[in-house]
């Protein structure tokens, strides 16, 4: 059940709904009286006075422009997940993202802009990580090694592809090491 569903059910029952920091548990489980989103767990009523300043800061944060709204999904087994909705939409493909940073990075795919340039060969990249990975082509650095056959790779994806195909590698290495 999602937070909005629980909040509307609580409003029907006359409970305190819409509070940014408090959610009453509606499950049939033996829950503590209050559910505190700020600490991602339950707290006792006796803790109210101790956490009053925390509640005030949460109320202030809920009015801030930078506040990220969170959705709490409560499972039937009592576990819960805090999910951040994808509110940033790409105007080119309508892809959804959790932050403006991820949206801006994604839009570079559509615009063709590649702000990161290799100083050796002038290749350009959308992400800094891709440039750093590319630089290993020039340096010859191969930091990723197969533990079965000890072959080295410059990229993790190449090592993972090798590992999928290297099942016979272990038996070859073992036979070679132990054969007389």
From Swiss-Prot:
Q: Where in the cell is it found?
A: Nucleus
Question: Any idea what this protein is called?
Answer: Zinc finger protein 740
Q: Name one Pfam family in it.
A: zf-H2C2_2
Any one GO MF annotation of this record: zinc ion binding
Entry's Gene Ontology cellular component terms: nucleus
Q: What does this protein do?
A: May be involved in transcriptional regulation.
What InterPro entries does the record tag this protein with?
A: Znf_C2H2_sf, Znf_C2H2_type
Compositionally biased spans, kind Polar residues: 1-11
Taxonomic source organism:
Mus musculus
Annotated Basic and acidic residues bias: 31-56
Zn finger (C2H2-type) start-end: 88-110, 116-138, 144-166
């Amino acid at each position: 059940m999602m937070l909005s569903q629980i909040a509307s059910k609580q409003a029907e029952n006359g409970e305190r709904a819409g509070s940014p920091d408090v959610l009453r548990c509606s499950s049939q489980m033996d829950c503590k009286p209050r559910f505190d989103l700020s600490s991602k767990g339950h707290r006792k009523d006796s803790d109210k006075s101790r956490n009053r300043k925390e509640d005030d800061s949460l109320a202030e944060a809920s009015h801030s422009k930078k506040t990220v709204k969170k959705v709490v999904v409560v499972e039937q087994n009592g576990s819960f997940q805090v999910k951040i909705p994808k509110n940033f939409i790409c105007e080119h493909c309508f892809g959804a993202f959790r932050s403006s940073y991820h949206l801006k990075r994604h839009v570079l795919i559509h615009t063709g802009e590649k702000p990161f340039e290799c100083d050796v060969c002038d290749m350009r990249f959308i992400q800094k990580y891709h440039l750093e990975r590319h630089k290993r082509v020039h340096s010859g650095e191969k930091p990723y090694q197969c533990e079965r056959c000890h072959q080295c790779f410059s990229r993790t994806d190449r090592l993972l592809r090798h590992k999928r195909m290297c099942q016979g590698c272990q038996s070859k290495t073992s036979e070679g090491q132990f054969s007389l």
